[in-house]
Amino acid sequence: MSETADASHSPTLPLPPPKNTFQRIAGVLFAPASTFEDIARKPDVLVPMLLILVIGYINTFLMMPRMDWNAVSEAQIEAIKAKNPQMTDADLERVSRMTQAFGKVAGWFGPLFGIVWWLIMAGVLLLAFRLMGGQGTFKQALSTVLYSWIPMVIYYIVVTIVAVGRGKIDPTHMVTVVKSNPAFLVDMKEQPILFSLLSNFDVFTIWMLVLLIIGCAAFSKTSRAKAAAIVLSLWAVMILIKTAFAAMAAAKMKVKTT
């Protein structure tokens, strides 16, 4: 009787102190299960987000001078000429300048657009898991998204290194600068739909998805199998939407050239 009472009143072991941001970054790469459990207990957002943004702007600073915006504007001008051959050279020059200006502005704002994307990802994931009976808060979901984004940070660092060594790069071919997905096996202009579809199956994207599954299972208190079903279903929907847009763009270009 006394042994039972002693056992019921035995003190529980205290939880280890939460890891700092750099320990968590290393942890999601080498020990993701325990690290995401730690993130779920005490999520953090500001420091990892700032680190990703700083690295993103370093990459942008190195990449922007190497972007061949002329190639983008020339391709657009060819499409415009095919549809409106009566356009004057002055009009085409104005379109070229606007295209290049927009590309440069979008490039510098790219890392900031990432914040919007992370917020959307966190909101959609949290909603999906809550609808499926899971738990969690928005802060847990956002922290999970940020730490799961580490493989993409590594990807952009690799892309930057390759771009710096290569010189000028056509921005429309950025997805195949690093041969980490099978899209490089097809020509983007000849098979735009297949190119868009294959670009989704990237090694770094799959790595990120695996981390998302582990992290979402941790904060939502669901099984990894259920987390995988939810995350991969949402990814499949995103692929369908992206491929549909590629198909519409291809159909539009086909109409212009006929």
Protein language model features and the residues they cover:
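Low-complexity, intrinsically disordered extramembrane tails and loops of integral membrane proteins
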Residues: 1-19
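Short juxtamembrane and helix-loop transition motifs at transmembrane-helix boundaries
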Residues: 11-16, 102-106, 191-195
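Hydrophobic alpha-helical transmembrane segments and adjacent short intramembrane/lumenal linkers
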Residues: 139-255
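A generic alpha-helix surface/boundary motif
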Residues: 30, 122-126, 209-211
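Coil-to-alpha-helix initiation sites in intrinsically disordered, low-complexity, charged segments
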Residues: 16-27, 96, 192-193
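Selected alpha-helical membrane-embedding segments in polytopic membrane proteins
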Residues: 21, 34-156
